[in-house]
């Protein structure tokens, strides 16, 4: 049973290795997510602009322009001219995620992940069992749909409903439609389907999952002979299907699926230290 603050699937790991060792990746993710939000909110709330803009397009310290490659792709489909600074910013972000793993955005940056993790914690804590099965390929169809919507409307239509943008605006400007969309995602994950948004529906995750297929940094089950089938890694992982080939297969111990979010949950929760961060060069 997964817990958001203290994870019961990690109790054995914590008992054997200590609490901090069994939660270090979880703590690092939360620190990164909060720091990312704080960097964007420092300007509107404190008058000191660390990041100006939003998660789609921003400027760091007034010098470095950064752009979400997914947003830039939509703008191209919408027929907008692509400015050189935006292209450079998108290339920088794209290369970064190509190195560390596309869906690291989902686990270490995206603030909506905090919302969906909280919903998942409440599901387990309250014993909610309803889990409508959703096809993981739905997010790929939604990704295609956002590109078609951009082409048909001449706008980045996705930004009108993007929960990440809505959450950021809600934190800065207060109550509004944005919070309604974030609440809808929360209720969907809580009452309808386990990890419905992040694992099945989010087109942003689908895009970065495609990038993640080629990333250098991977989780490795390099000590898989020590696995005692306790299941802690599967109960912690938001994409448990990615673990089986690496843990139980005969080939590479690397988790190679683009669906892996490189969150380190399996590393934290395993009492036998089966998993570790690695790379394609050194499995």
Curated annotation (Swiss-Prot):
Pfam families: Fer4_10, Fer4_5. PROSITE patterns: 4FE4S_FER_1, 4FE4S_FER_2. [4Fe-4S] cluster 1 binds at residues 227, 230, 233, 270. The keyword Nucleus does not apply. GO terms for cellular component: plasma membrane. Keywords: 4Fe-4S, Electron transport, Iron, Iron-sulfur, Metal-binding, Plasmid, Repeat, Transport. The keyword Nucleotide-binding does not apply. Pathway: One-carbon metabolism; methylamine degradation. One of its GO terms (molecular function) is metal ion binding. InterPro entries: 4Fe4S_Fe-S-bd, 4Fe4S_Fe_S_CS, Electron_Trans/Redox, NapH_MauN. Signal peptide: none annotated. Residues 217-248, 251-280 form the 4Fe-4S ferredoxin-type domain. [4Fe-4S] cluster 2 binds at residues 237, 260, 263, 266. It comes from the Bacteria. Involved in electron transfer. This is Methylamine utilization ferredoxin-type protein MauN. It comes from Paracoccus denitrificans (strain Pd 1222). The gene is mauN.
């Amino acid at each position: 049973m997964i817990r958001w603050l203290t994870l019961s699937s990690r109790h054995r790991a914590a008992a054997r290795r200590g609490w901090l060792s069994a939660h270090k990746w979880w703590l690092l993710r939360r620190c990164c997510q909060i720091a990312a939000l704080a960097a964007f909110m420092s300007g509107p709330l404190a008058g000191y602009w660390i990041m100006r803009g939003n998660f789609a397009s921003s400027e760091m310290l007034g010098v470095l322009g950064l752009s979400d490659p997914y947003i830039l792709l939509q703008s191209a489909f919408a027929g907008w001219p692509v400015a050189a600074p935006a292209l450079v910013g998108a290339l920088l972000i794209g290369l970064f995620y190509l190195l560390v793993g596309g869906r690291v955005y989902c686990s270490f940056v995206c603030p909506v992940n905090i919302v969906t993790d909280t919903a998942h914690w409440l599901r387990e804590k309250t014993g909610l069992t309803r889990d409508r099965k959703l096809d993981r390929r739905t997010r790929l169809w939604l990704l295609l749909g956002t590109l078609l919507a951009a082409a048909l409307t001449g706008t980045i239509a996705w930004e009108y409903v993007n929960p990440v943008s809505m959450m950021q605006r809600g934190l800065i400007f207060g109550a509004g439609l944005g919070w309604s969309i974030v609440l809808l995602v929360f209720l969907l994950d809580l009452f309808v389907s386990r990890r419905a948004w992040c694992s099945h529906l989010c087109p942003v995750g689908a895009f970065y999952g495609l990038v993640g297929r080629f990333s250098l940094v991977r989780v490795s089950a390099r000590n898989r002979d020590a696995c005692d089938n306790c299941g802690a890694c599967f109960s912690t992982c938001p994409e448990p299907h990615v673990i089986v080939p690496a843990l139980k297969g005969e080939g590479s111990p690397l988790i190679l699926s683009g669906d892996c979010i490189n969150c380190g949950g399996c590393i934290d929760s395993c009492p036998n230290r089966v998993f570790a961060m690695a790379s394609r060069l050194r499995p």
